[in-house]
Amino acid sequence: DSDIACYSRPEVGNHILIGSEDPECDIRHEVDPDNWDNNFSEQWTTQAMRQAQRIPSLGITSKMRGAVDLYDVTEDWAPIYDKSSIHGYFMAIGTSGNQFKNAPVAGKIMSALISHADAKKDHDVAPAQIKLDRIGHNLDLTHFSRLRNINPDSSFSVLG
């Protein structure tokens, strides 16, 4: 919901999980992923108040609950599904926390990349492809390459 800069989903136990769309009005914090504070901040209340605009019965509890964590993202917000410079090591990274919805196709992509390498084909030279059965097209996996050029016309978000 870009009007309130939040996304949410129900959680077990009559709870709701709320995330931020990282609006420009919020203070941005660059953190060291190996050394950062994962305690709640005043941003927790801001997110709860924003979500309460959509769910008035939500109310604002005085007991903070949930998780504070980081997620990985690439420069253009498109994931990397590719081999690495370490032989036999493949990557599915930079998913910006949204690719759980694409898990079946991500598995198909990774399977194709690994099979391509097992057949002694170099994905950097002759890119792997997968068949998209429902629409009858092939998908060239260079779009997800670690070596791809950043698309300057990207939305640089998961919102399209």
Task: State where each predicted segment sits.
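C-terminal lid/capping helical subdomain adjacent to the catalytic/cofactor pocket in oxidative enzymes
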Residues: 85-160
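Active-site lid/adjacent beta-loop-alpha segment flanking the redox-cofactor pocket in flavoenzymes
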Residues: 1-87
